[in-house]
Amino acid sequence: MGPREVLNKLKWGGGENLRKAKITILHRGAPGDKRVIEGTDILELGRGFMRVLSPEEEVYIPYHRILRIEASGLVVWKKSD
């Protein structure tokens, strides 16, 4: 199961699991080249990307940049090395 499927499962699985999720992405230039996105900042789960509200603007992040997905403090998906 890839990151898109995991995020959709969190979104449609009931409750507010996607809103409580933390998604770590590859973000060149950020400390450690990583950035954490809160589930509450996800505006849309598209076919090849997620649309996210960032402090500056809305941005499109391709799923292949996702490194890890956490839900309720547990890692539910991690990119293989």
For each feature predicted by the language model, list its residue ranges.
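Short, compact, well-ordered microdomains
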Residues: 53-81
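N-terminal recruitment modules of adaptor/scaffold proteins
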Residues: 1-57
